[in-house]
Amino acid sequence: QKDVVPWKFPPKHEFMYGEWLREQFDKGAIPEPTYDPDLAILLSQLRENSINLFGPEATEVIEPVPMTDIRRAIKESLPGLIASIEGDERNVILTLARMWLTSSSGRICSKDQAAEWAIPKLAKEHATLLEKAKKAYLGDYDDKWEGMETEIIELVNYLKRSIESSLNI
């Protein structure tokens, strides 16, 4: 708690687990504590959406995250996210849609909700690709991105420009 209260950017985490890290953990690779801009977004979501099972509510122990820090986290996370696209196309595309929604509206929502918001704002070829990513995320489509590299790059570049425009950078 001392790493996030009082609030300061970027926040630091001791340990973070997600299914995407399972293989790394199974091999015994446990990352060191680190400063992570994306944690600002996660903590904001935690305050907004957590369901308390025991102890104090998240809103009682974690301070609000200013929107300026959420926007800063998006800006700082954007290059690394795009660089990690190979083999993680669905997640990257959906995360970019979510970044665009948040940087445009200040709302944080699920990846499929962000895709729903973004799809009508996209050209047909981009919307089709984002729809595939959303369906794969929901388990209604098999992730098959081979042969779509050019289309993926074009969509990623469009989403990147849209995010940067929303952030005024």
Language model: regions and residue ranges:
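Conserved NTP/Mg2+-binding pocket subregion across the NTase superfamily
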Residues: Q1-E86, N168
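Extended, basic/helix-rich recognition subdomains
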Residues: R71-A133
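Amphipathic, non-membrane alpha-helical segments in soluble helical-bundle scaffolds
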Residues: D36, M67, E86-R90, A123, ...
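Structured mid-to-C-terminal alpha-helical surface segments
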Residues: R107-I169
